[in-house]
C-alpha cells in the first residue's frame, strides 16, 4: 500500500489505498474479468457504490486487437466499500502513513502515483499479450474483418493524449513546480522515462496485433501469374498497374465563347444508353403517356380537371401506385432526353448559317427529340438514336421554314429545296462537274415544272451592310448598282428624244399637236382623258377621239418616224 494523490478520485491524498489484482480465466465460453480495484477509506456514503471504468477510457490496445480475446469485452471496476470498517482503516492509515503537507511532498507523491499506475498498465498489457498469444495463434488469420484495432482510429495526437490520461493532472502539478526544487526534477525525469517506455511498448503491440494479410497482395500475385502465362504463350499483356484505377474526370477549362457551354456541362455526366436501358425507358414513357391520355379523357368528359383520387380510380390503382408510376415515367423520359442531347447538337450544327443561331436550332431539335421519345417503340428492334434522328431533323427544318425567312415559304417547298441541294451536292461529288437541271430532276423525283418553281423560290435576304470580299472590307451597298438610278447617258438620250418628238409633232396640225401633247402628258406629266380634253377645247368627247385618230395616221408615215427608230432599239 502506498500513499498517493489522484485528482480523479475525490479522496484525501493520504487516505487512498490501491490494490491491483488481475485474474485470468481459462479460455471458456464465459470470459473472465480483469479487475482494477482502488479503495478509498474516507467515504461516508452508507451504501456500496461501484463505479465502472471502461477499457476504452484507459485506451489499452491489447484488449481491443482481438475480438475473441477473453478479456476484451470486460470492464475495469473499482469498489468503494463503506461501513464500520472505514474508520478502522482510516485510523490504521493515520498510524502508518505520514500526511502530505508541503508542496514538494505533494509533487513527489503525484509523480510516484503516476509511475505506479504506468507500471501497472504496462504489466497488465504484457500479461494480456502473452495470454492472447498462448491462447490461440491461429486467430489472426481466421477473420480479416475483425483484426483491425481501434488503435488505428486515433491520430498520433490522440494516442499521446490517451497514454497520458492517467497522469494529466499530475503533469500539470509537476510542470508548475518544476523549478521549485532539484529533487522534483529527478522525480519528473523518472516519470517521463517511465512514460516513454510505456509509449514504446504500447506502440509496438498494435503493430504486432495488426499483422493481418492483405487481400491486395493475393490479387497482385494472381495478376503477375496471369501476365507470365500470357508472356509465355506469346500474347502481349497490357500493364494495368497494381490496383484498378478509377477514371478521373479531368476538369476542362470552360470556354465562355461556346454558346452551348451550360448545355454541355449539364449533359457531360450522362452516358449513352444500352439496348436494354432503351427498352426499359421506353416502357416507362409509354406508361406515362397512357396515364396522361386517361387524364385528358377524364377532363373532356367532366369538363374540369379530375382530382388525383378520380385519376387513380380510373386507372384501377391506388393513389400511391399512381404517383410512383408517374414519377417513374417522368424519370425515364428525362433520362432518355438527357442521354441524347449530344445527338441534337450534332444535327443542329449542320444547319448553322441558314438564318437562325445555334441556340435556337438546338432548342427546336430538343422539341423533336421529345416527340421522338414519346413515339419510340423499342419492340420494333431499332435503336432510339436512329429513330429520333428524323424527328430532330424535321423539327429543325420546320423551324427554319417558319422563322428564318422574311418571306415565308410553305414547308413542302422548303423540303423540296433541301432535296435539290442534297442531290446537287451528291451529283457534283460523283461526276466532278455541276449537274444539269434534268439530272437534278431525275435524282430528286421532281418534275421540271416543280424543279423550276423550287429554283425560282425567294432566296434568304441579305443585308446590304454585311462585310464581303477577301478582306471583309466591302459592303454590298458599295458594289451593287441601283437599277433605278438615272445616269447622265439616260438624261442625254431623253433630251435628244424630246427634241425629235417636237420636230415630228410640228409636222401635224395645231389641234392634232395639242391633243397628242395633252393625251400623253407631255405638258405637265399628267395624262388627260378624252372628256377632259373636250371640255378644255369646247368640243365633244367623240370629236377629240377623231382628232387623235387622224394624228396617229399621220405619225405612222415612215417619213415622219424614220429618225425615231433608233430610240426603240436603245430601249429594247
UniProtKB/Swiss-Prot annotation:
Pfam families: Sigma70_r2, Sigma70_r3, Sigma70_r4. InterPro entries: RNA_pol_sigma-70_dom, RNA_pol_sigma70, RNA_pol_sigma70_r2, RNA_pol_sigma70_r3, RNA_pol_sigma70_r4, RNA_pol_sigma_r2, RNA_pol_sigma_r3/r4-like, RNA_pol_sigma_SigB/C/D/F. SUPFAM superfamilies: Sigma2 domain of RNA polymerase sigma factors (SSF88946), Sigma3 and sigma4 domains of RNA polymerase sigma factors (SSF88659). The keyword Transcription regulation applies. Residues 530-549 bind DNA. A motif (Polymerase core binding) lies at residues 360-373. It is found in: Plastid, Chloroplast. GO terms for biological process: cellular response to light stimulus; chloroplast organization; DNA-templated transcription initiation; regulation of RNA biosynthetic process; response to red light; tRNA metabolic process. Residues 1-39 form a transit peptide. Disulfide bonds: none annotated. GO terms for molecular function: DNA binding; sigma factor activity. Residues 215-249 are annotated as: Disordered. Disruption phenotype: Pale green seedlings exhibiting a strong reduction in plastid-encoded tRNA levels. Aberrant chloroplast development; normal etioplast in darkness, but abnormal chloroplast in light characterized by small size, poor thylakoid membranes and stacked lamellae. Keywords: Chloroplast, DNA-binding, Plastid, Sigma factor, Transcription, Transcription regulation, Transit peptide. This is RNA polymerase sigma factor sigB. Required for the transition of plastids into chloroplasts by coordinating nuclear and chloroplastic genomes under light conditions. Sigma factors are initiation factors that promote the attachment of plastid-encoded RNA polymerase (PEP) to specific initiation sites and are then released. Promotes the biosynthesis of plastid-encoded tRNAs (e.g. trnE-UUC and trnV-UAC). Belongs to the sigma-70 factor family. Highly expressed in cotyledons, to a lesser extent in leaves, sepals and siliques, and barely expressed in roots. Present in seedlings. Induction: Induced by red light, especially after dark adaptation. Moderately induced by blue light. Induced after two days of imbibition. It comes from Arabidopsis thaliana. Coiled coil: none annotated. NCBIfam families: sigma70-ECF. GO terms for cellular component: chloroplast.
